Amino acid sequence: MSNTGFRFKQFQVNHDRCAMKVGTDGILLGAWADVMQAKQILDLGSGSGLIALMLAQRSSAESRICAVEIDPAAAQQARENALASPWKEKIQVYQQDIDSFCTQTAQRFDLIVANPPYFEAGIACRDDERNTARYFTQSHLHWLQTAQRCLAPNGKISFVLPLAAGETLLKTTALYCIARCDVRTKAGKAPQRVLLTFAMQPQPLKHSELIIYDAQNQYHEDFVTLTQDFYLNF
């Protein structure tokens, strides 16, 4: 990965005008979220458009994706990334805050995804864009409740979060967690991230685990399997 962009098998993500660069969290969510039967998809806080592009690759030809990003420079770059991809007809980018979009839209979505801000408010940050991307004071519960406003009755919401933040969200939301994947950066280490899927109706929980690196510091086979449609070296 360079400071200007990241090349995947079927598309390029330029991110030099985005506060948050392409990273493992977004790649995990884009590869893990369940796109089966998802015709209308919403990516909240889209940044460079990474997750929207991954879901465009994985979803059916009939699927349509709305990518919402508050920062003007990032939204424009996400739009350019989408237009340069094989799925420019599937992705529409909106430069808007998530509250306004989810309040104003009449669309109801089958799948909503987000890699929301995760650092605590009050910590000094180097520039305003990164402050917006990483330190925004809205809670993860607020993000989930905002997403729920435009969720279809049988729709799903998928987040990627630090483990502690995910545990807190599970205790505070009234939605049902129907899928959970605990992510270990390395075999033998405690999980640091969690992928969560919520729904409005109860379903049996699908609980799994993913390891990124094995004990020999090589990519674990499960991580390769999950992401092999995207990474050039897999």
Curated annotation (Swiss-Prot):
Report the record's Gene Ontology biological process terms: methylation; tRNA processing
| Enzyme class of the recorded protein, top EC level | transferase
State any single GO MF term: nucleic acid binding
Asked if the record carries the keyword Lipoprotein, the reply is: no
User: Its Enzyme Commission number?
Assistant: 2.1.1.223
Q: Which SUPFAM superfamilies does this entry report, sorted A to Z?
A: S-adenosyl-L-methionine-dependent methyltransferases (SSF53335)
Q: Which reaction does it catalyse?
A: adenosine(37) in tRNA1(Val) + S-adenosyl-L-methionine = N(6)-methyladenosine(37) in tRNA1(Val) + S-adenosyl-L-homocysteine + H(+)
- Where is it predominantly found? cytoplasm
Q: Which Pfam families match?
A: MTS
* Superkingdom of origin organism: Bacteria
Cellular compartment(s): Cytoplasm
One GO cellular component from the entry?
cytoplasm
Q: Which UniProt keywords apply?
A: Cytoplasm, Methyltransferase, S-adenosyl-L-methionine, Transferase, tRNA processing
Known function: Specifically methylates the adenine in position 37 of tRNA(1)(Val) (anticodon cmo5UAC).
Query: Which PANTHER family does this one have?
Result: TRNA1(VAL) (ADENINE(37)-N6)-METHYLTRANSFERASE
Please state which protein family the record places this protein in.
Answer: Belongs to the methyltransferase superfamily. tRNA (adenine-N(6)-)-methyltransferase family.
Q: HAMAP family from the xrefs?
A: tRNA_methyltr_YfiC
What is the protein's name according to its record? tRNA1(Val) (adenine(37)-N6)-methyltransferase
Organism of derivation: Aggregatibacter aphrophilus (strain NJ8700)
